[in-house]
Amino acid sequence: MTTPHTVRIWDLPTRIFHWTLALSVIALVITAKVGGNAMEWHFRLGHLVLALLVFRIVWGLIGGRWSRFAAFVYAPARLVRYLRGTPHPDDSVGHSPLGALSVFALLAVLVAQVGTGLLSDDEIAFAGPLTRFVSNAVVGQATGYHKEIGQYLVLGLVALHVLAVLFYVLVRKQRLVRPMLHGDKALAGPVDASRDDMLTRTVALVVLALSLGLAWWVSSLAAAAF
């Protein structure tokens, strides 16, 4: 019987990002549906998600081994092999080829949703901080996408992501949730671990601080208009 190798796959910054983003998206949906004064929190959460997305893009370039985009950018042939049931051994380590598509799609849709949110105006009490830099036509288009298209794309991809996780956990008996909590995976063979030491976490804090600073600066542009 082969002894499983316990390997650190998801570094702490990636795990914190994942769960913070998940909770933030849930809160954004709730505040959007409630409306009224809850929209103040909707805007704050939107800026938090902006910071998280900036952080993840940077971390996808310099983060842990399996958190980097290079670790889950797959060639089409690799995806076809995975769908045919003949996956590469590394496909079960970090994000699988299908999981990678889900990650990139969700990041892209969230970037579009946050971007259009910054340009949106509800014509009542709340307007994004970048509305003063563009024409009314652009504001109208951004608002329309944000309310009528983007939110449903986000909800659809989140639902698809949850269903996929449930399928892999319940049907394929793969533990996907626990590694995103404690970072480690039990694998059949040795693989390179993600670096997750104090230096890595310190760098992540610096990146996060800069990302939060950028989001705060963007939010301050609204106040500068008055």
Per-region residue spans from a language model:
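Membrane-embedded alpha-helical bundles that constitute the cytochrome b-like, heme-associated redox core
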Residues: 1-226
